[in-house]
């Protein structure tokens, strides 16, 4: 309606798969089975921060299991479900199976970019903020796509993900509120968002900037758009992050005896 209600900056706070097309085909990156097999065959690696609760969510959400924030700030979670199409334990075992591959590396963003730059890592689950690093590492092979499917009880299940946005905040108690609001308005205007998007790979929230040729043609943003069909808005309570990370680390290490007990 032409009115400014806030200062939205980006609409690309999600994750997808970067990969080097010099080593991997579109068929290779369509599933975790194919991806890891191709990497193992070539003596290369694939990265994802499985021990990060933000990324781990994608497996369980893709299998139709729930994690969401209630009005009182608590969470509703059925990742230990035994009466759903895909049991939580089956999903957890599928994650552990992925992590057992000698090509799979559980790593954070900075390490993944370093591994890609030295030629070791040919694919990584990451976000738009990592675009410049993977562009440099993969060169003319730089590519991106939606997240792979993974195998649960013999079925190929599409991974889900989180989707989110970033805003510029203004301190209402600053001595220079007016100037601060003008700065926020400048940072988030169409021209600035377009420039930031071109420089960093982030996706603008401004609709005109988002459809500009320079932005719309970016592989990472095209991949994010493709993944958005399987993404959920990030609506989880604060008590999710710690236990989620602990669960992810346990699945990475295989440090459990009873997966149902682990989920419970």
Enumerate the language-model features and the residues they cover.
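Short helix-initiation/N-cap motifs at beta->coil->alpha
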Residues: 30-33, 104-117, 129
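Extracytoplasmic/periplasmic substrate-recognition and gating elements
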Residues: 136-200
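Paired acidic/hydrophobic, glycine-rich loop segments that form the ligand-binding mouth/hinge
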Residues: 122-127, 143-145
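Glycine-centered hinge/linker elements that transmit conformational signals in sensory
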Residues: 74-108
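Short loop->beta-strand "edge-of-pocket" segments that line small-molecule binding or catalytic clefts
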Residues: 34-48
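Short helices/loops that flank or line small-molecule/ion binding pockets
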Residues: 23, 37-41, 96-98, 110-124, ...
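Periplasmic solute-binding protein
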Residues: 1-30, 50-76, 162-170, 241-250
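C-terminal capping/gating helix-and-loop segments adjacent to ligand/active sites or protein-protein/ligand interfaces
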Residues: 162, 199-205, 209-264
């Amino acid at each position: 309606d032409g009115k400014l209600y806030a200062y939205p900056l980006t609409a690309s706070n999600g994750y997808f798969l970067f990969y080097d097309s010099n080593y991997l085909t579109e068929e290779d990156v369509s599933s975790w089975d194919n991806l890891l097999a191709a990497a193992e065959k070539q003596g290369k690696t694939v990265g994802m921060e499985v021990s990060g609760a933000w990324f781990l969510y994608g497996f369980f959400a893709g299998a139709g299991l729930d994690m969401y924030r209630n009005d009182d700030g608590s969470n509703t979670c059925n990742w230990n479900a035994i009466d759903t199409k895909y049991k939580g334990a089956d999903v957890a075992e599928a994650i552990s199976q992925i992590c057992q591959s000698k090509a799979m590396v559980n790593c954070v963003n900075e390490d993944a970019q370093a591994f890609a730059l030295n030629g070791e890592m040919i694919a990584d689950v990451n976000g738009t903020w990592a675009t410049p690093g993977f562009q440099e590492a993969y060169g003319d092979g730089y590519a991106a796509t939606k997240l792979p499917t993974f195998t649960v009880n013999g079925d190929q299940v599409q991974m889900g993900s989180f989707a989110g946005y970033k805003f510029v905040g203004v301190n209402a108690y600053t001595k220079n509120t007016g100037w601060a609001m003008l700065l926020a308005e400048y940072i988030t205007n169409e021209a600035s968002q377009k420039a930031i998007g071109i420089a960093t790979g982030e996706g603008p929230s401004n609709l005109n900037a988002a459809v500009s040729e320079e932005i719309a043609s970016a592989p990472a943003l095209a991949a994010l758009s493709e993944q958005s069909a399987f993404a959920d808005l990030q609506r989880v309570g604060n008590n999710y992050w710690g236990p989620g990370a602990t669960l992810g680390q346990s699945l990475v290490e295989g440090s459990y005896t009873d997966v149902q007990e682990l989920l419970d």
